Swiss-Prot record:
Keywords: Ribonucleoprotein, Ribosomal protein, RNA-binding, rRNA-binding. NCBIfam families: bL25_bact_ctc (TIGR00731). Residues 207-216 have a biased composition (Basic and acidic residues). Residues 194-206 have a biased composition (Acidic residues). One of its GO terms (cellular component) is cytosolic large ribosomal subunit. It comes from Thermosipho melanesiensis (strain DSM 12029 / CIP 104789 / BI429). This is Large ribosomal subunit protein bL25. The lineage of its organism: Bacteria, Thermotogati, Thermotogota, Thermotogae, Thermotogales. The keyword Flavoprotein does not apply. Signal peptide: none annotated. Part of the 50S ribosomal subunit; part of the 5S rRNA/L5/L18/L25 subcomplex. Contacts the 5S rRNA. Binds to the 5S rRNA independently of L5 and L18. GO terms for molecular function: 5S rRNA binding; structural constituent of ribosome.
């Protein structure tokens, strides 16, 4: 997994709109860090650094966060995850960001992006890839989190799906969707007929019954 680093400063003024606006004019974005074993810590981050980071990470990316005080001393260092981002409704700029610092050895809930790779057999026959879930909600230990899950769908034929039960998740990670939930399917467009194979078992009873009628 790629290593992502971010530096921040402690923020003493909390909840005052004027102070927050002053921060933003200085090119800083307010934020907070919290977790099960730490006190919430108000921080500010250089806007350019945060925007660059947001282009590189997902919700499942581990970020090494270092927070310093006014004198430049490091007062907090922890691996964190992005928990929530507030955007301005008019400008779509980041207004505030929440980071979650997980407790070591304890599980957390997170959404992991899914990346479907390979050209399915069904697509070569005219089928269409329909992605049902772009992310997988999981309960997981922080130590086994991955930035994305790659799923090979090259063997999927017309009308076939890749289900949660087909995933091979690392030990310590559990999907929070039913096992029979499809993640992606190869849809059959109108006008394309799928050949149905008839098994010997299905044909045999008809032959036997025909023999009985002839005996009668």
């Amino acid at each position: 997994m790629a290593q992502h680093k971010l530096e921040a400063l402690t923020r003493n003024v909390v909840g005052k709109k004027r102070a927050v606006r002053r921060l933003r004019k200085q090119g800083l974005i307010p934020g907070v860090v919290y977790g099960p074993d730490i006190e919430p810590l108000s921080i500010s981050i250089k806007k350019s650094n945060l925007i660059k980071l947001l282009y590189e990470v997902t919700e499942a990316s581990i970020i090494s966060l270092s927070v310093k005080d006014e004198t430049g001393n490091e007062v907090f260092s922890h691996d964190v995850f992005i928990k929530n981002i507030q955007y301005d409704k008019l400008t779509d700029e980041v207004k505030h960001i929440d980071f979650y610092a997980p407790e070591k050895g304890h599980t957390m809930n997170i959404n992991i992006p899914l990346e479907f790779i390979g050209k399915p057999k069904g697509v070569e026959k005219g089928g269409i890839v329909e992605i049902i879930h772009h992310e997988l909600p999981v309960e997981t230990l922080p130590s086994v989190i991955v930035e994305k899950l790659e799923i090979d769908i090259s063997n999927l034929d017309l009308g076939e799906s890749f289900h949660v039960s087909d995933l091979k998740l690392p030990t310590g990670m559990t999907a929070e969707l039913p096992e029979n939930e499809p993640l992606v399917t190869i849809a059959i467009p109108r006008g394309i007929e799928v050949e149905e194979t008839t098994s010997e078992e299905e044909v045999e009873p008809e032959v036997i019954e025909k023999g009985k009628k002839e005996e009668e």
